[in-house]
Amino acid sequence: KARLMPWKKTGLTFPAEEPASDVEDILEPEIATPEITEVKPREPIAFPWLVMSALLLALMAQRTLEPPDRSIGLAVALYTLAGLAAVIAWFGLRQWSPPPLGEEASQPLPTTLRRTPLLIGCGLLSFAFLAFGGNQFNSFNLTLWLAGGALVMYALWIPDPDASSFGQRMRGWLIRPEWKITITPWTVMVVLSVLLVLFFRFDRLAEVPGEMFSDHAEKLLDVADVLAGEHRIFFPRNTGREAIQFYLTAAVAELFGTGLSFISLKIGTALLGVFALPFIYLLGKEIGNRWVGLFAFLLAGMAYWPNVISRVGLRFPLYPAFAAPTLYFLVRGLRRRNRNDFLLAGLFLGIGLHGYSAARFVPVVVVIAVGIYWLHSQAAGNRRQVIWALVALAFVSLIVFLPLMRYILEDTSGMFGYRALTRLGSVERPLPAPAWQILLSNLWKAWIMMFYDNGGIWVHSVVGRPALDVVTAALYFLGSVLVLARYIRSRNWLDLFLLISIPLLMMPSALSLAFPEENPSLNRTGAAIVPVFILAAIGLESLVHSLRTQMKPIPGRIAAAGVTALLLLWSGVQNYDLVMRQYDRQFMAFAWNTSEIGRVIRGFAESQGNPDSAYVVPYPHWVDTRLVGINAGYPLKDYALWPENFAATLEEPGAKLFILYPKDQDSLAQLQQLYPQGSLQVYDSVRDGKDFYMYYVPPMASDTGG
């Protein structure tokens, strides 16, 4: 038994625990781990050579997969050796093991409820459902909806008999008002980690990425509708979009005074990206320990993948933002057998359905998670109760989803599901191969994207490279091997779910059957960052724990700190370069320079006094003329002027400015014939291939006052 459970000889402490900090207590108390019988510790070895060999082999393997020069065969061989070394280090030499899973609660889930508030809440929700007609939020239906939902939550909520009420705590503080702040090394590490993550997520946010494209114009038009008092439940523009981003951006525009602009979109989505990180920490802590949580928080916070999908200003981070708390509360509810956690999971699940269409697969993930739990021995004595808890979760999520449900039943155009159907079926184009073949191929490509290729979409990725940096990919591989080995040995449902959740959360990308070239994509796989970075953190924590426990105390501490610092530094430097240099250069090379055109038009308007006498002549596959207006500071103005309408500008006596694509010689010839007094200049863009023509027409003589 000791050989099968090696941690009983090496201890579980990683690193030497400081006294529990206020930060940790506020975030979440841990479940007490079972007391471990002390076994005479084995003599510390000089160095855990096999553990470090596994790490070095994994790092070398991933380095060979970095573009442009790749060696797939060598990488497979090195990764195979790394996996074998990790397994031997655990089972053979007992030098390595993942952090142990804490003891799960044994009491069954409660099934009691408060009937009266439940009935009243359901009644209010019925009226709210009717009041949501017309695809509009208003004070009446919102009041009914929120009041009904609050009553249902109260009816299903299980009070904690050991927790004092807010009123009691407030009275106690008023009697003896005092503040107690304890600063420990752990507190300092948490604060520094938060500051580092905020730096990665907000540094140069206004500049990277530096241009908008057509989707941004659509989003800002919807935000303009919100600011104008149009409070839709579902926004049908551009094949339909859920509402959260538009209300969030409107709030940012008003709160920060940024208006209808690219930075308003980016501030909102960057905040959503940060919102997911505390729940990644908490889930890592629930699955492993606080070090797993902190490492997952750091690795995900610095990583290029979640950073770029948060910076681009579209709805992409909404998928992980609400999947992370859903998964955290679901896992905690199953482990602790606490129905309140199921209710919170349902709340975040429902909110996520108002965010990004990829979140529509999360309910399937929740059901599969409960199914995996139900089939394992950890569910003994709790199987019937967990089904009722799942029903409560689904009911709460349905309440939050209620406005969209009303819209779906009322809308006859099928707009809500149109985008998904165009990818899943042959609505827009026939499937290029049998569906099952495409699905298997897509799943494989999505699964290996962490190591090999994250897709070819320049908008939100560095095309053709792995989704993870070298260090994180290697740690993710090692963490996955350790968790898989632990599942084979102990058959704990959580290990299996942690591994299976990754392809499940990638399904919105893999289900692009009609357009397999869109898979993999970092946006539709976004929620997979939650288990991916937790597995990477497990790999790092187990590595450092091995150094601490297998070596003598002082050398072990030094080695653990040094290896951790080196790996995090390597990861941080590469991720910063991926976002701030590689992604930035690639994005700006592909995106059209509407910001430069906007600055030219704004300068013309300020000098000539009339923004309405500047025009952009459209040309196929060139700039979106709506973005020109946004960049010029006139966000609701479309600057397009088609050649057939040139003559209408003769009625304007003032100065005029026409912006043209250099290849559009026909339009230029028409303007020169119409305005022979005009002058042509070439705007020399700072980016290659992005020059444009400026055809300036001076004001008529009578308009100058001469």
Where are these predicted regions, by residue range?
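Transmembrane-lumen/periplasm boundary regions of multi-pass, lipid-linked membrane glycan transferases
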Residues: M212-F234, R241-A243, Y247, E254-T258, ...
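Specific aromatic-rich, kink-prone transmembrane helix
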Residues: L298, L318-R335, A345-L349, I502, ...
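Membrane-proximal, lumen/periplasm-facing interface regions of secretory-pathway glyco-
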Residues: V208, T472, P555-P643, V686-G689
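Transmembrane-helix signature of polytopic, membrane-embedded enzymes
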Residues: L260-I263, I280-M302, D495-I500, R557-A560, ...
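Membrane-interface transmembrane helices that cradle and orient dolichyl/undecaprenyl
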Residues: M153-P159, T326-L344, G352, S377
